[in-house]
Regions:
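Zn2+-dependent peptidoglycan hydrolase active-site motif and core
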Residues: 73-119
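Non-catalytic extracellular/periplasmic "stalk"
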Residues: 14-40, 53
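C-terminal motif of bacterial Sec signal peptides marking the signal peptidase cleavage site
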Residues: 9-12
Length: 187
């Protein structure tokens, strides 16, 4: 009991950032955006070059072959679908995307889906693990992958991302790390 009290006091007095200045994520509401048992490598994490800076600071890229199943990371309602762009055109703004609004009015964005890769419809309710779409290589990118992020607003491409973590893999309180492969564990 004394240990528990000390631990809680330690948490309440601690800083809300890590030694490298990144926020420490305590609330893990999300699951990895791919099926249980599958594993993919993080090709770009939080606050990293070339593109996860500024408004995109808190985003994760997973290397995935075109056509890989992408699943809902949290319960919500489909509020936006764009799936009309071809893979590999390397044109900024041609990113196919599905956006899910959560109960707390945050938004999950599943970006770079393949042409006609949305496997949901507008206003559809999804729960963690439901199929959302198929990964791709649409828009400007360095190869086939899924770009996943969370925002508090949905006004367009430049919405500010917010920190998040996943409950069904190895915990990283400052975000997943580039070059590490993460298996989606049961939750």
């Amino acid at each position: 009991m004394v240990s528990l009290i000390f631990f809680l006091l330690f948490l309440s007095c601690g800083s809300d950032s890590s030694d490298n200045g990144q926020p420490i994520i305590i609330d893990k509401k999300y699951v990895l955006p791919y099926p249980i048992g599958k594993a993919y490598t993080c090709s770009q994490g939080f606050n990293s070059s070339p593109s996860h800076l500024g408004t995109f600071s808190y985003a994760i890229d997973f290397e995935m072959p075109i056509g890989t199943l992408v699943t809902a990371a949290r319960s919500g309602r489909i509020v936006y679908i764009l799936e009309s762009y071809s893979d590999n055109d390397q044109i900024d703004g041609h990113e196919n995307v599905v956006i899910v609004m959560h109960e707390d009015s945050t938004y999950a964005r599943y970006v770079h889906l393949t042409l006609n890769g949305a496997l949901v419809h507008m206003n559809q309710i999804v729960v963690p693990g439901d199929t959302v779409g198929l990964s791709g290589s649409s828009g400007t990118n360095g190869g086939p992958h899924l770009h996943f992020d969370i925002t508090k607003t949905f006004n367009g491409k430049s919405d500010q991302t917010i920190p998040f973590d996943f409950m069904n893999t190895i915990s990283h309180p400052v975000g997943l790390q580039r070059g590490v492969t993460y298996e989606a564990l049961p939750y």
